[in-house]
């Protein structure tokens, strides 16, 4: 495997790890939503989802380059 492909694979893995953390954080916010301000929670959930979507798009783009 070329050095570039290994680097790209590590980028994909890092994105996957980050997505996992963001999804866990999002789930935690969902559990806490009854204890905190609902409008603030909605804002944070929306931001998390946007970040997750962006990271997934970047991961998919990198995977396409690797193939």
Task: Please provide the spans of the model-predicted regions.
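Amphipathic alpha-helical coiled-coil segments
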Residues: 22, 53-67
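Short amphipathic alpha-helical heptad-repeat segments
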Residues: 17-33
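Positively charged, hydrophobic/aromatic-enriched amphipathic segments
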Residues: 11-15, 58
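Short, flexible helix-adjacent loops and helix caps
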Residues: 34-41, 67
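Short, charge-rich amphipathic alpha-helices with coiled-coil/heptad character
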Residues: 1-12
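Short, charged, amphipathic alpha-helical segments
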Residues: 42-56
